[in-house]
Regions:
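Tandem CBS (Cystathionine beta-synthase) repeat/Bateman regulatory domains
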Residues: 1-287
């Protein structure tokens, strides 16, 4: 199955244009439907593809307003490439949305979800591969009462887009993703006081601040994340999978529930996590 058969064609792809500002991309990324947005620019031969703006770029660089400075150059594929080629590229690059570019022009977007959907429908190789060996046994977790800004920091440090939420007994009770966080994040303008302004000494979640060096105010522009507990934003209905289930079974669960990861369970114990990018290994090895 080729990329052209699975991709979203250019006429249906949401893009932003240079010149522009971060708000142009934020209105699409904040809705949670996309993890990145293609950036185009008018050229001598028509519209030219310039790169992607990602959620991560907006969060990591909150003071950058110029769209051109937020653009990342990313690997691309042609419309004639196979979905196995896409699976391999995603595994190597870590980009979930791959621009389809023919002769410097954006022809469409192909995503991890497109490959997973083809796997769920039995349209590509890898359907009968068992998911146990594909899963990751290290699971990123957070406590249910962890403030959401701290959860965001933990996702950044762990370099994963999810966290399983644990209850007071240490049992998984939900899943929280970067999509859940970006949906409630807001860009705030204002003034920040530096120097003597440190966290409350009685704050249970105090993070060590910079040593006080005097008071001054600086104009700031930050991504504000509600300081509320993780459990208020998590998905409570955990959809799980066992080691012996096939890649096609897991793909069908992901597509039907619109999720990107499945806790791997043995009896009542969570022993790993199966992410959509893990399933791509089935497509590659069974090609």
């Amino acid at each position: 199955m080729n990329v052209a058969d699975a991709m979203t064609p250019r006429e249906e792809v949401v893009t932003v244009s240079i010149p522009g500002t971060r708000e142009d991309a934020l209105e699409y990324l904040q809705g949670g439907a996309f993890s990145s947005v293609p950036v185009v620019k008018d050229g001598e031969d028509g519209e030219e593809f310039r790169g992607l703006v990602t959620r991560e770029a907006l969060i990591e660089r909150p003071d950058e307003d110029q769209l051109a400075l937020l653009v990342e150059e990313v690997p691309t594929v042609t419309s004639e490439a196979s979905l196995a080629d896409v699976a391999r590229l995603v595994r190597e690059s870590g980009h979930n949305r791959v621009p389809v570019v023919d002769n410097d022009h954006l022809a469409g977007i192909v995503t991890v979800t497109d490959v997973i959907r083809a796997l769920a429908n039995g349209e590509i190789a890898g359907t009968d591969v068992e998911v146990g060996p594909l899963s990751t046994h290290a699971v990123n977790t957070v406590y249910r009462e962890t403030p959401l800004p701290v959860v965001q920091a933990e996702l950044d440090y762990a370099d994963v887009p999810y966290a399983a939420v644990l209850d007071d007994e240490g049992e998984p009770e939900g899943m929280l993703t970067e999509v859940d966080i970006i949906e409630v994040a807001r860009v705030e303008e204002g003034e920040a006081e530096t120097g003597e302004s440190l966290a409350d000494e009685d704050d249970d979640w105090k993070w060590e601040g910079i040593k006080a060096t005097g008071n001054r105010y600086l104009p700031t522009r930050n991504v504000e994340i509600p300081a509320e507990p993780a459990h208020r934003f998590m998905s409570e209905d955990l959809v799980t999978v066992t080691r012996k289930r096939t890649a096609q079974d897991a793909a069908q669960l992901m597509i039907s529930n619109d999720i990107e990861q499945l806790p791997l369970m043995t009896a009542d114990d969570m022993v790993g996590i199966l992410r959509d990018i893990d399933l791509l290994a089935a497509v590659i090895e069974d090609e």
